[in-house]
Amino acid sequence: MNNFPWLTAILLLPISAGSSILFIPQRGNKAVRWYTICICLLELLLMTYVFYYNFQLDDPLIQLEEDCNWINLFDFHWRLGIDGLSIGPILLTGFITTLATSAAWPVTRNSRLFHFLMLAMYSGQIGSFSSRDLLLFFIMWELELIPVYLLLSMWGGKKRLYSATKFILYTAGGSIFLLIGVLGMGLYSSNQPMLNFETSANQSYPVGLEILFYFGFLIAYAAKPPIIPLHTWLPDTHGEAHYSTCMLLAGILLKMGAYGLVRINMELLPHAHSLFSPWLVIVGTLQIIYAASTSLGQRNLKKRIAYSSVSHMGSTIIGIGSMTDTALNGAILQIISHGFIGAALFFLAGTSYDRIRFLYLDEMGGIAIPMPKIFTMFSIFSMASLASPGMSGFVAEFLVFLGIITSPKYLFIPKILITVVMAIGMILTPIYLLSMSRQMFYGYKLFNVPNSYFVDSGPREIFILISILLPVMGIGIYPDFVLSLSVDKVEAILANYFNG
């Protein structure tokens, strides 16, 4: 049973089954929706079954490994495998994509293409998280960008083409650095390309070259989480995209950059990472303050939530730069936690817009009375986003805090400064989230819209929101549910630094 290529099956199922969508009749929108949801559910069940029976929690090594020679000419292998670092993002991808396909129920224009692109994106993301070959990682990284660009440019607001072009310029520009880094590492000191992650991890480079590789990969990944100053595509894109696409962007796409930083920069380039880590902590700290302050000034609801995503990813970057197992576990937990919370907030923003047709906060007001269910869920997820105790965000940010305070790498005064600045960011977070809730839901009704728009959340929407709320509260109450996946792998990664 262990010889069966489970990861290949998990990776290829969405895109191969999705290809059949194109043969469904043009007017069969309902059939397309149900078919896509069934594929996503089947994929999620397959994933859960395979990981439950074949994944050992206490083993930090690569599991479910597959290695097949693909192109002999330059020793290119189809090499897949998962460990404690990748299993969480893969399960998150399955969960959020399944809910995003349910959220896309109202999409009727070109619905066959829309759902096919969602499934193609699904395969690309699973491929990125499970690749064990540098070139395969790059191919999957790029494969995932094409459907995202088409989803952004074809469905959304009036400026969707502008925002999609901005997105592809940032991410494709970063991909050039990723390709150069992959080829540089693969071709270094060998006539035969060495693209295997394990071989690259044991390879030592001159310090100058390692710093060059590290910086190239950092630029490639900085556009995704995003890290300031490469973040400006995110508010525009979220402001224009359809909310089901926003769920995939906030829930999964932003996490790929943080995953790449740990997987390649930390694991394969440890000496350069120990030099760059203080700068990552500084940038992450500034990002929390900058994005929280900017979010407060946004009139557009979706842009305000987008800047809150940038702010929350700052704590992930601090965790990656802290060089302690506590903070790195917190960063990985924040990746999972924000995946759920960000997806839920964008879904709520989109469903609210579908009803009231306003995105600007100063045009809203008094929505709580006609739409109490949306008001309740928005309030709960706002509390989760501002790291309220009992929610997953609290545990993640607390671990990052604790990790940076106890880090032996930094002196006492810098640690105090970083902690104070992070605390200021955590004070700003409830200010912009609670003011957003006040402007939307409280006060008088400032607009004249026919009452037919004021239909509260239906069963489908409530089901999606409760499905996201349960893991958010579950992780908040029992964080070991996620931490047990990554704790051994994190120890193994950091052992390279303290032994070397």
From Swiss-Prot:
It is a multi-pass membrane protein. InterPro entries: NADH_Q_OxRdtase_chain4, NADH_Q_OxRdtase_chainM/4, NADH_UbQ_OxRdtase, ND/Mrp_TM. One of its GO terms (molecular function) is NADH dehydrogenase (ubiquinone) activity. Its EC number is 7.1.1.-. Keywords: Chloroplast, Membrane, NAD, NADP, Plastid, Plastoquinone, Quinone, Thylakoid, Translocase, Transmembrane, Transmembrane helix. It comes from the Eukaryota. One of its GO terms (biological process) is electron transport coupled proton transport. It is found in: Plastid, Chloroplast thylakoid membrane. The keyword Thylakoid applies. PANTHER family: NAD(P)H-QUINONE OXIDOREDUCTASE CHAIN 4, CHLOROPLASTIC, NADH-UBIQUINONE OXIDOREDUCTASE CHAIN 4. Belongs to the complex I subunit 4 family. This is NAD(P)H-quinone oxidoreductase chain 4, chloroplastic. The lineage of its organism: Eukaryota, Viridiplantae, Streptophyta, Embryophyta, Tracheophyta.
